[in-house]
Amino acid sequence: MIKPILGTKKIRRVICIIIGLFCILLLIGIFKHNSTNSVNNEASNFTVDFEEPSYTFPKTVLFENNNNLDDLLLAKKNNWKFQSNVYNQLFMDHSIESVLSLSFNQRCELLIRNIISQKVSWIFDPLETFEINYESEDYIQFIQQEGIKLNKKFEKIKNNLKFKTSLNNFIKDEYKIIRSKQYEQKIIDQLTILRIFNKCFIKNGSKDQNDLVDRIIQEQQKLVTKANSAANGQSELELELKLKLKLTENEKMVSELVEDYVTLGKRVYPWISQRFPFYERWNGDSYYYPPNYEEIFKDKNEPLKSERSTVRDSTSSPSIFLNQFKDASNGKGIVLSITEKHIDDTINLIRLLRALNNKLPIQIIYFNDISQSSKTKIIKAAREEINNFPKSYEKVYHGKQPSVPPSPPPPQEVWFVNIYESINPQHRNLFAKFDFKLLASLFNSFNEFMLIDADTILMKSPEFFFNHQSYQQTGAFFFKDRSPLLKRPITDGEFLIKMGPSSIDSIMFDIPMMTQYTTHRELFKGLRLYMESGLVMIDKQRRRHFNSILMMNQLKFIHPISNSMWGDKELFWLGFAINGDENYKFNNHFAAAIGQLTSNQYNKDRRTPLKSKEICSSHPGHISDEDDRSLLWFNSGFRFCHEANNIDYQEETKNNVILKFLNGRHPLEFKKYYSDPLRITHAIVPPLNKNFQKMYNYDEEPTDGWTSEPNCNKYMWCAYSSIGGRTGPEETSHKETLDGLLVEYTPEEIAYFNYLGDVWVGKY
C-alpha cells in the first residue's frame, strides 16, 4: 500500500480554499454592484446592530457544498446572505476584493473593528440562555405588538389546521418559531466571533502552521489582483486604488477599543476573572501561577524561584490572560474535578494509581469546596508507605503479570487546584455538577492531560494512554458511550452543523469546515448518546486544541446545545468540531458491559437457551480497538453497584428481576454482593442496528443491544452479544441477526482484574 505523502491533507485544504476563492472572484467579475464599494458614503454612514430583533428572515445560503459556483451565483442573484451576519455586515461596508487583499492580521483587526463599530458595548453574555419563556416580559411585549395581527391570522386558518388548537397556543407557536430563528442566528453570530477571536488573538500553532496560513493569504491576494485586472483591464495603479480598503467612520471611532486586546478578551470571555487558579502541593507549597514542573522535580531539596509565585493576575501584563496561561502550562499529568462527596472515590482512585505504578503528577481541581481534613485524607492515601497487599496480589505476582508494580507502590505527586478566583463572582453560580469537568480541562496547568472522574477505573497505566497511537496522532483521544436505542431529533444534528464554520470562515481565516468525519457520526444521525467522558485525553499545545477547549466551555452557556446533551459528555468532541478542529480520534468500539455472563438457566425463563449471551452490569467498559479484547478502563467505581450505600435493600430484594441467583437471600447478603468488587470474566460490546431500529424476531432473541433495568438505583444495564432472529413464525423463515463483540478473559487476566478491584475497595 502506498503511504500518503506528508502534508497531503494540508495541500488538499489549500487547493480547496483557492478553488473556492476563485469561484468568488469569478462572481465578482460577473456581477457588479455598488453596495459593496468601500468608498460609498452610504456604507460609510450605515450601521446595523445585527443583534437587534427582526421579524423578517432573508434566505440564507450556508456555502457548504465545496464552494459550488452555481450556489454562489444563485445566492447572489437572490440577494444572498452569508451564514453569519458578522460577514454580511462586513461586506455591506467593504467590497469583497478589498477585504481579501488584506493580510491575515489586517483581516482580524478589520472584522473585530467592524463588529464593535456596530455595537460598542458588544459582549458575550453568559446569562443569556436563548430559551423560550412564555412568562417573560419579551413574550408579553410580543403579544401586545403582534396579538391583533395573529388573532386575525388565526381566525382565517383555524378551520384548516391539521391539529386543532387554541388562539393562545397558536400565538405561543408563532412566538417560538420567530424567536427560535432569531436565537439561532444570534448563536451563529456569537460562535463566529468566538472562533475568529481565538484564531486571531489566542496563540495557536507552530511556525510551520502559521507559514501555511500566510501562503494561503498570499495566494488569495494574487488571485484577487489577477481576477480584477483581467475583468476590468485596469492599470496597476487603478487596481491598487480600488483594492485599498477604507474604514467607515464608525470603524475609525473604535480604534482604541480594538487595539486593547486585554479588554477584547474580557468581552469574549467575561466569565473568566483573569486570575490564575491557586495551586497547592501536597507538602504545603503554594503558587498563584502555574507551577513549573521541570523546575520543581529537578531537585526536590532546592527552593523554588520566588518570582513564579509573585504574579497574582494577568492585568500587569499587556497580553491576553489566556495566552499567558497557555504559555505557562507545562508537563503532563492526570486531572480530576471533585467535591466533598467524591473524597472516598478519590482515595480509592489514588490507591489504584499507586498499584498501576503511576508516576505522573495529579491535579485535583475544586471550587473552594474541599475541606482541609479531606485534603489530609487524600494526601495520606497518596504518600503513606504501603506494606499490606490484598491476597489476590500474590496470585497475580506469581502469575508473572507484567503490569504489577514492584513493592511498595510509589507515592503520588498530588496537587490541589482551587479555581474559584478564576471565575468572575457574578458568574460563579452558573456552574454546577458536570460543568466543573469542562473548567478542569481549561484551568489545569498541564500541556498534556488525562481528565478522569473520581470513579474512573484505569486498567492500564496512565502512560499507556499517553503513548496510545490514536492520542499520539491527534493529541485528542475520546471514548464512546453505551449505544442503546435512545434517539434524538435529526434536527439536532442539522442545528449543530449550522453552528460550525462556513466556507467564508475557511477562506477568510483558515478555519476548516465540518466534514463527514464529524457529521457521519451516529449522534448526527439521531442517536442520543455518543461520548463517554469518564476519560478524556487532550494535548493543549496541538494546533487548535486549546481553542477547542475554550469552545467546549463556551458551549456550556448556549442552552439550545448544552440542554440537548447528557451532562458534559458530548460537549468535549462537539467543542472540537464546532471550533473547526477535527484532529481528534475515538476508540472505535462503543462501550461494553463488563462482568459475568448470565447463566442460561436464569435467562428469560426459557427452556431453550438463547443464542445471545447476556451481561448485566452498572459499569460501561471500554475495549481496545487495537486488539478487540483488552479492557482499558471503565466507569462507576469497582464495586458491583456504585450506589451500594444509597439503596433500600428491603425494596431491592422485592423488586429484583435480573439477579435471580440472589432471590430469597437476606437483604444483608444483597448488600454484601453490591458492595464487593465487581468480578470480570467477560465483556460484551452489543451490536448496533445502523438504522437505529429494533430487530423484532420470532426466536424471542433480544431486539436491542441494551436494556435498562431497575436494579442499583436504575444504573443497571443488560447487554447482549447478538440481536435479531427469524423474521417469520416458520422454522425455515429468513433470519436477520447482528453480532457484537464477546470477550472471554483468561485466568491470568481475571486474577489481575481481581487484584485491582481489591485494591480499589481496600480489601486487604
UniProtKB/Swiss-Prot annotation:
Main localization category: Golgi
GO molecular function, one term: alpha-1,3-mannosyltransferase activity
GO term, biological process aspect, one: mannan biosynthetic process
UniProt keywords, alphabetically: Glycoprotein, Glycosyltransferase, Golgi apparatus, Membrane, Signal-anchor, Transferase, Transmembrane, Transmembrane helix
Swiss-Prot/TrEMBL induction comment: Expression is regulated by SEF1, SFU1, and HAP43.
Cellular component annotations (GO), alphabetically ordered: Golgi apparatus; Golgi membrane
Glycan-modified residues: N45, N204
Topological type in the membrane: Single-pass type II membrane protein
Keyword Transmembrane: yes
Residues of the signal peptide: none
Pathway field: Protein modification; protein glycosylation
Lumenal side: 35-764
Documented EC number(s): 2.4.1.-
InterPro entries: Alpha_mannosyltransferase (IPR022751), Nucleotide-diphossugar_trans (IPR029044)
Localization: Golgi apparatus membrane
SUPFAM superfamilies on file: Nucleotide-diphospho-sugar transferases
One Pfam family, short name: Mannosyl_trans3
Family statement drawn from the similarity comment of this UniProt entry: Belongs to the MNN1/MNT family.
General function of this protein: Responsible for addition of the terminal mannose residues to the outer chain of core N-linked polysaccharides and to O-linked mannotriose. Implicated in late Golgi modifications.
Name of the protein this chain belongs to: Putative alpha-1,3-mannosyltransferase MNN13
Organism (species): Candida albicans (strain SC5314 / ATCC MYA-2876)
High-level lineage: Eukaryota, Fungi, Dikarya, Ascomycota, Saccharomycotina
Protein encoded by which gene: MNN13
